[in-house]
């Protein structure tokens, strides 16, 4: 705590208000509210805190405060300050998720559309729906029943929808406005759950069609009735009064809060909104902040009622939401709030369970591996593999795992420079010498463990270079594969021995992932190099076609076959002079001969870890 903060802490009033924490750059990193500014702000700089609060406090170099007349005024100010400044430590509805609505437009001849924007334009809005797929499903059903116009600008001729019975083509059939308003009312009734009349009408039409032996049309009516029934079953009735309401529940544990919002429309639970985030203040105060942001940021209609838990300040919510606010004591409304709270608890428990499993797969795996090999926990593991075909285009690759996860920015690729022919041991010697010679020269941080994709011979070569040539003390292990090319044994120690490692353990799965990844990276690099070399050999000896133009051709056409099939004009468009383009075509198409198979391979010059060690 610096002297500026110490001085300001002495000046804090006991009034309600907002406080604003800033970092060394003057950036606002957190906005909070308090009933008593002095007590709240001082609490950040006294005593111990959990990890997330310690992280916040470590960045605070200054703070400001704004006094308000009441705690509710402080709440409203806090929400506006968060919206304006977007502090990184505050609760933020970052995705600004907007839900789809079905809308009947306020036009002379109305349309039925899906929108995410609710406007005061006289249109009728129904929703929100959980996603655009659910909204489209209902709209498709409505389109089959109600022939609203589909075109934004009505055409002079009838459209496709007219021919399939989904548009009245009002410019031709001359239905009056009253007809369409009546149809809009039927849709409104349907979306409010009053669909019995529509089903009765469809049943009557189905019976008439069947009596007239129009069986295809009768089947269409039957399918519509079944579709309505299916839609009904998907929407569970949660309240008998068929009202629209949002139901809030929250749960806190281990410094995290989960808020669940149930969207109940016409008594049916149609969707829920789930948000999990760390909290820094009293849970009920951070919950109020969330509610304020929810209705300020979300594009969704405020319902007739909002149900909240018992421990929340009802008057504060009323200041945030222009709706009837209830804290139900009993009955089905109380059950709805309890259900939202229960779901919030389950969601938070699932988050912690997933975190524990993730730690078990990564941090737990490297800790167990360290104990098994009797070395410090191998936070950073570097693994090597070689790749060549009969000694051609020999390469090696290194992948890096940090805390049990791949760190692709640290991957490295090596072209073998000193080895002639297929000599895996010599290739391993070269790449280990190059990598750790550089680590030694540039004082880079060495890994905690080196894993060689290979058996005893490759591991011993690596040991010779690391320990005898370079004098480094880095543990080295080897991963042997079986005859099915699967991870089989872990070799470690001096002399090397097979480590007793359970094939069902997380540490074995980690080593398996490392071996698979380094093999993938090495073989991918080898294929790229081999294809590139084949490409170069095919175009060698053409005057005016240097390395840069060859590379441009490959980037544009992707393969020799595509270049061979291209016209001279198309090659010229890549920046190759016409005389050179003609020479390329003559070289690649001598009397119509076919190109070798390898020319079909594509080359991608942009891969992860696209770095070559010296």
Swiss-Prot record:
Q: Which GO terms describe its cellular component?
A: cytoplasm; excinuclease repair complex
Give the GIY-YIG domain ranges: 14-91
| Cited InterPro entries | GIY-YIG_endonuc, GIY-YIG_endonuc_sf, GIY-YIG_UvrC_Cho, RuvA_2-like, UVR_dom, UVR_dom_sf, UvrABC_protein_C, UvrC
The places in or outside the cell where this protein is found are: Cytoplasm
Q: Which UniProt keywords apply?
A: Cytoplasm, DNA damage, DNA excision, DNA repair, Excision nuclease, SOS response
Q: What is its main location?
A: cytoplasm
Q: CDD domains under this entry?
A: GIY-YIG_UvrC_Cho
- Biased composition of type Basic and acidic residues is found at 599-614
| A GO molecular-function descriptor | excinuclease ABC activity
State the Gene Ontology BP annotations: nucleotide-excision repair; SOS response
Specify where the region named Disordered lies, as residue ranges: 595-614
Question: Which SUPFAM superfamilies does the record associate with it?
Answer: C-terminal UvrC-binding domain of UvrB (SSF46600), GIY-YIG endonuclease (SSF82771), RuvA domain 2-like (SSF47781)
Q: List the disulfide bonds.
A: none
- The lineage's top-level taxon is Bacteria
* All copies of domain UVR, residue ranges: 196-231
Per the similarity annotation, which family is this?
Answer: Belongs to the UvrC family.
The entry describes its oligomerization and partners as: Interacts with UvrB in an incision complex.
Q: What does this protein do?
A: The UvrABC repair system catalyzes the recognition and processing of DNA lesions. UvrC both incises the 5' and 3' sides of the lesion. The N-terminal half is responsible for the 3' incision and the C-terminal half is responsible for the 5' incision.
- Which HAMAP family does the UniProt entry name for this protein? UvrC (MF_00203)
The entry's protein name is: UvrABC system protein C
| Gene name tied to this protein | uvrC
